[in-house]
Amino acid sequence: MRFTVKGKTEAADISGEVEAAVSHRIPVIGLYPAMENTVVLELLDKSGKVTDSQEITITTDELPDKLDDAVKPVKTSGESAFELTMVYGQRTTFPFAYDCMGDIRWYMSGEFTSGIYMLSNNRMIVASNEAFMPSQDKPQTTNLYEMDYLGRAYTMYYVAVEITMK
C-alpha cells in the first residue's frame, strides 16, 4: 500500500509505503495546515504495480500561532534531496518540518524544549520535559522516548545517572 499527499507542486508530493496486509492503517504525514489535502491511496501487487487506487480528502486545522511565520523562504529551487526538513531546538518549542517550497507540513503539538534526536529508522528520540525535570543536581532530563512522526511511543528510556561530557 502506498500513500501520496499531493503537494502544491509535484516536487512537494510526500509518499510512503506500508507492508501488505489484510487490513491497513496508513500513517499519513505531510498534510498542509488549514486546507483540504488530497491523499492518493494505491494498492500494490507483489511487483509494485498499482492494482487499485482511491483519492481521499483530509481537512486540517490551522498552525499554532507560534508557527505562523516560522519559515520565510527568500529563494527556493522548488526541489530538495529530502521530502521534509526537520527544525527543532534553539527557540523552537514546537518541532516542525517543512517541504521544498517552505510550507510547514508536520509539527509536534507538544512543547519539547529539551531536544529531539533523529534516528535512521524514521523515528526520533524525544527528551521529555514533562516529568523528572532537570535540576541543579541532575542537569538533564531523565526520561527519553523513542517515537515516530505520528507520536506513537515505542520505547521509554530512563536515565538514572548524570551524563557528563569529558
Model-derived segments and their meaning:
Residues 12, 17-20:
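Short, conserved catalytic-motif segment at the N-terminal edge
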